[in-house]
Amino acid sequence: MASTKRRLNREESSVVLGEEQVAELKEAFELFDKDRTGFIKKDALKTTCKQFGVFVMEDQLDAMFAEADTTKSGAIGFPEFMSMMSRRMKQTSNEQILMNAFKTFDPEGNGYILTKDLSKALTTLGDKLTEAELQELLSISENEQKQVKYDLFVNTLFSKK
């Protein structure tokens, strides 16, 4: 599974941020740097993420912070914060693109797509998966009715575990 996730997440680089986004991130960082040390702690990070529409689970937050806190000091400065948020914003964007693509295969709007439709799309369109990669993904996401709940599928693809 890890190799498939790496392949699907291979663009780990940060999003190029515009001046306005950098200014917004700086403003948010300063807002949560209450003691004006130039650093924020993990508890302030969750609030900052929500402000930017980046919703994360606690374990994801722990992983994001651990990755950004390269000095293991328990706090991150603005450059680390900006890099981390940029990567997360890119991931969120990619997740949304994939969710929207899956919705086209869900005419009933019930959150499920047929395994055969997903298989065809992932092995014939765009950056094609191999049969082995496809089977690896389906093994964790297919239900008894030969359907895939696509929000769970997308979350699995983009999780860092």
UniProtKB/Swiss-Prot annotation:
Keywords: Motor protein, Myosin, Phosphoprotein, Repeat
Gene3D superfamilies on file: EF-hand
Any GO BP: myosin II filament organization
Annotated EF-hand domain residues: 20-55, 56-91, 93-128
Complex formation: Myosin is a hexamer of 2 heavy chains and 4 light chains (two regulatory light chains and two essential light chains).
Other facts noted in the record for this chain: The sequences of all three RMLC calcium-binding domains have diverged significantly from that of calmodulin. Therefore, it seems unlikely that these light chains bind calcium. It is potential that phosphorylation has taken over the role of calcium-binding in the regulation of Dictyostelium myosin. In D.discoideum, cAMP stimulation induces RMLC phosphorylation; this chain is phosphorylated on a serine residue.
Protein name per Swiss-Prot or TrEMBL: Myosin regulatory light chain
Organism annotation: Dictyostelium discoideum
The encoding gene: mlcR
